[in-house]
């Protein structure tokens, strides 16, 4: 092979002559700059031959980077035309056939033409000369490049720190620019571009620009790495400490599951849709729990608290059914009658279907025992698709029963409201508050006052239980309360929508017995319908002669008695079936307990049938009066309370003021004592609604005119003889019907209430509205008293005082 021609090596001011002929070593993924000493590993045959060729002559070779690193035998046009002339300092052949070579770049060169040589690449190239430039400007740039390069090397851990010391000692600015460029972490095309630039100033500017941009990125990377490292160290430290704690607890015999329980609670907190306040509270308690021994008493308290907090429903709602026809079917199937209540529920569902913003209604079902208040609430839950929970308030005296105990007390728990919500598992159940009128009050607080927050739609969205100490939303709950009387604190009563449920009529009871009570008795006693039957007449007789109530509880007990006796008879006598009729009814239930429709056989003087309202419905009230020789005293007995005593006084005063109109001689009041008795004596009685009955009894006694036996009456009387309205009309009319009385006198102002009375009640009674006592006496007495003429005496007699059982006087 011929020797390699070359130009005189170029420095800063050297100029090139004609092209020299050089062996070319194509480089992959590296650009060699002048003044750089670089080790290279050579494995391709052509490249090894090129090295062997130059080692035998002047050891100069042209290093040019190929454009595609994956090309094993690059064509001339696949090699960059700007390269570096380098001296081969050392060549070492390795056992695997590759060659390690140490080269030193001397000058830039531009390839003009490749030869046709086949065994290795060979090309003509001319060394490139750097232009003359302003030395002051270049020195200024160099002063900026060196400190930036130091900073860059500190941030980029891939570059050896010794390079910085070497770079700071370089006086040749061209060499400085090439040294910095060779160590920059830039792509091959960008490095090749730096190699192609002859101007030292431009090379320094490019290096400075790149380093400033890269330093910003490296600083961010450093911060990220530091943060990640700190986080990893913290995680590793916590893991290490937790493992140590587990090992210590295991040695001490503590539960191995203590930490697992904490992890489980943390997972539950993450999954539960807690309010912001509740989540902060839960995380704070969990943090405390982590620092405690699992076996400590305080840890148990915290665990119990977190369990309660996470067990109640947060945002979990049942889908409320809005099918009005379905709701009506459910209510009708499970309860007979009760039209007003059903109508109100269907109205609520209709509004709910249009607007989801409406608050749940708070209904209060008021009525006597056994009319189906509690079971109706269960049916409402079924009709609306809500979960059903019940809380009995009967006998509750402690406010903590509602709001819970504070956690400072040993064994503290949330109140019954939160406990019931946990049981419901949904945040919009139907919540039945049973017997709300039976709540008590003592030194521990007033639970009815605590209920004010629960039953106020404006407040219960932020209900605060003393145990939980976080607000809980009850605004989606549909509250239904039940009561026997309206004896409820006024603020609490004001928050509820009152729906009165009066007693059932005889026909309604008969239907309830046939549809519900009889099938239930057959099922509960494991009977077949063909084995046990009760005729309609028998059921009616049970209602009339064995029960006297507004509801159907006693009726249910009697039907159950029939079923029990039927089972006993079938098993004893091997009968195939038992049929109860009105003929054999007494064989199973014994003698009749109540009279029905058996009023007094004859009209009597001084005996009047009044009407009363009690907690268990309406009742007939017999009022008896007698007259005897005496000194004008009036005695009242029968366990009467103040209002009824005053009503008797008003009646007596009215009769005395109108004595001559009733045919009574005024001196008679001074010569006779009158005794009014209201059986039964053991039952307390109160209220003004027996006023007209008292007037009728006193007039009958003083005139001797009998009172009709088939008439009952109710109404308050004034001293002027007006009849005032009363309450509980439906219950009183039902009692009249049960008692077999056909005619009833009611105040005229109560006539408007007849619209709510069932038609079968109105059709079976002659209801007469009255406004004055004269009208009452016209209907009640067998004949009308005839007025008399009387001249006022000189010494008018005083109105006799009214005496109770003890003989104490009561002023009129």
Swiss-Prot record:
Disulfide bonds: none
Annotated compartments: Cytoplasm
Lon proteolytic domain: residues covered: 602-783
Predominant localisation class: cytoplasm
Keywords: ATP-binding, Cytoplasm, Hydrolase, Nucleotide-binding, Protease, Serine protease, Stress response
Catalytic activity: Hydrolysis of proteins in presence of ATP
Residues binding ATP, per UniProt: 367-374
Active site: 689, 732
Listed CDD domains: RecA-like_Lon
GO molecular-function term, one example from the UniProt record: ATP binding
Segments forming domain Lon N-terminal: 22-215
Keyword ATP-binding: yes
Region annotated Disordered, chain positions: 787-812
PROSITE patterns assigned: LON_N (PS51787), LON_PROTEOLYTIC (PS51786), LON_SER (PS01046)
Gene Ontology biological process terms in this record: cellular response to heat; protein quality control for misfolded or incompletely synthesized proteins
Induction comment: By stress conditions (acid shock, heat shock, ethanol and puromycin).
EC number, as in UniProt: 3.4.21.53
HAMAP family: lon_bact
Family that this chain belongs to: Belongs to the peptidase S16 family.
Functional note: ATP-dependent serine protease that mediates the selective degradation of mutant and abnormal proteins as well as certain short-lived regulatory proteins. Required for cellular homeostasis and for survival from DNA damage and developmental changes induced by stress. Degrades polypeptides processively to yield small peptide fragments that are 5 to 10 amino acids long. Binds to DNA in a double-stranded, site-specific manner.
Subunit record text: Homohexamer. Organized in a ring with a central cavity.
Protein's recorded name: Lon protease
Organism, as annotated: Brucella abortus (strain 2308)
Taxonomic placement: Bacteria, Pseudomonadati, Pseudomonadota, Alphaproteobacteria, Hyphomicrobiales
Gene that specifies this protein: lon
């Amino acid at each position: 092979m011929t020797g390699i021609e070359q130009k005189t090596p170029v420095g800063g001011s050297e100029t090139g002559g004609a092209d020299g002929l050089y062996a070319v070593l194509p480089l992959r993924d590296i650009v060699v700059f002048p003044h750089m000493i670089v080790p290279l590993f050579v494995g391709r045959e052509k490249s090894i031959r090129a090295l062997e060729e130059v080692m035998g002559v002047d050891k100069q070779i042209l290093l040019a980077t190929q454009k595609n690193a994956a090309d094993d035998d690059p064509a001339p046009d696949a090699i960059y035309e700007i390269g570096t002339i380098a001296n081969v300092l050392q060549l070492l052949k390795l056992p695997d056939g590759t060659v390690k070579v140490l080269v030193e770049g001397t000058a830039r060169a531009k390839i003009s033409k490749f030869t046709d040589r086949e065994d290795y690449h060979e090309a003509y190239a001319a060394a490139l000369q750097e232009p003359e430039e302003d030395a002051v400007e270049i020195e200024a740039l160099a002063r900026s490049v060196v400190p930036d390069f130091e900073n860059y090397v500190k941030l980029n851990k891939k570059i050896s720190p010794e390079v910085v010391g070497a770079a700071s000692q370089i006086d040749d600015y061209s060499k400085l620019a090439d040294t910095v460029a060779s160590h920059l972490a830039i792509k091959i095309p960008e490095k090749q571009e730096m190699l192609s630039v002859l101007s030292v100033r431009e090379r320094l500017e490019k290096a400075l620009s790149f380093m400033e941009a890269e330093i910003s990125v490296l600083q961010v990377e450093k911060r990220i790495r530091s943060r990640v490292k700190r986080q990893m160290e913290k995680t590793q430290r916590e893991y290490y400490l937790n493992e140590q704690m587990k090992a210590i607890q295991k040695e001490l015999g503590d539960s191995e599951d203590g930490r697992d329980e904490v992890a489980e609670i943390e997972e539950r907190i993450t999954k539960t849709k807690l309010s912001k306040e509740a989540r902060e509270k839960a995380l704070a308690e969990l943090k405390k729990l982590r620092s405690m021994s699992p076996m400590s008493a305080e840890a148990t308290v915290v665990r119990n608290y977190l369990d309660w907090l996470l067990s109640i429903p947060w945002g979990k709602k049942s889908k409320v059914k809005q099918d009005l026809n379905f709701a009506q079917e459910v209510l009708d199937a499970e309860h007979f009658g009760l039209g007003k209540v059903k109508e109100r529920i269907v109205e609520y569902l209709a509004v709910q279907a249009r607007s989801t913003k409406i608050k749940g209604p708070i209904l209060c079902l008021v009525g006597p025992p056994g009319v189906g208040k509690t079971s109706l609430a269960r049916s409402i839950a079924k009709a609306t698709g809500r979960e059903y929970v019940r809380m009995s308030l009967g006998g509750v005296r402690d406010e903590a029963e509602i709001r819970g105990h504070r956690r400072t007390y040993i064994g503290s728990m949330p109140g019954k409201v939160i406990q019931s919500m946990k049981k419901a598992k949904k945040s919009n159940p139907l919540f039945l508050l049973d017997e709300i009128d039976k709540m008590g009050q003592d030194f521990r607080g007033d639970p009815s006052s605590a209920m004010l927050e629960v039953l106020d739609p404006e407040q219960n969205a932020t209900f605060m239980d003393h145990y939980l100490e976080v607000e809980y939303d009850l605004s989606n709950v549909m509250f239904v309360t039940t009561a026997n009387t309206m004896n409820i604190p006024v603020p609490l009563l004001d928050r509820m929508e009152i729906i009165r449920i009066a007693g059932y009529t005889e026909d309604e009871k008969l239907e309830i017995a046939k549809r519900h009570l009889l099938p239930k008795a057959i099922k509960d006693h494991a009977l077949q319908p063909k084995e046990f039957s009760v005729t309609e007449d028998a059921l009616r007789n049970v209602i009339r002669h064995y029960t006297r109530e507004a509801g159907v509880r006693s009726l249910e007990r009697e039907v159950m008695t029939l079923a029990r006796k039927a089972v006993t008879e079938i098993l004893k006598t091997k009968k195939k079936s038992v049929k109860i009729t009105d003929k054999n009814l007494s064989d199973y239930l014994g003698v009749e307990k109540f009279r029905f429709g058996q009023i007094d056989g004859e009209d009597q003087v001084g005996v009047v049938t009044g009407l009363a309202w009690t907690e268990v419905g309406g009742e007939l009230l017999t009022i008896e009066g007698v007259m005897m020789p005496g000194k004008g005293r009036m005695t009242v007995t029968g366990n009467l309370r103040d209002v009824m005593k005053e009503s008797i006084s008003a009646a007596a005063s009215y009769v005395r003021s109108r004595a001559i109109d009733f045919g009574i001689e005024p001196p008679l009041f001074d010569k006779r004592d009158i005794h009014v008795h209201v059986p039964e004596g053991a039952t307390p009685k109160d209220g003004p609604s027996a006023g007209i009955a008292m007037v009728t009894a006193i007039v009958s006694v003083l005139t001797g005119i009998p009172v009709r036996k088939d008439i009952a009456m109710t109404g308050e009387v004034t001293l002027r003889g007006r009849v005032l309205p009363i309450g509980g009309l439906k219950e009183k009319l039902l009692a009249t019907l049960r008692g077999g009385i056909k005619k009833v006198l009611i105040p005229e102002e109560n006539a408007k209430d007849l619209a709510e009375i069932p038609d079968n009640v109105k059709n079976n009674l002659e209801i007469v509205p009255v406004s004055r006592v004269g009208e009452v006496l016209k209907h009640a007495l067998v004949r009308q008293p005839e007025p008399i003429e009387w001249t006022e005496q000189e010494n008018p007699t005083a109105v006799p005082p009214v005496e109770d059982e003890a003989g104490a006087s009561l002023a009129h």
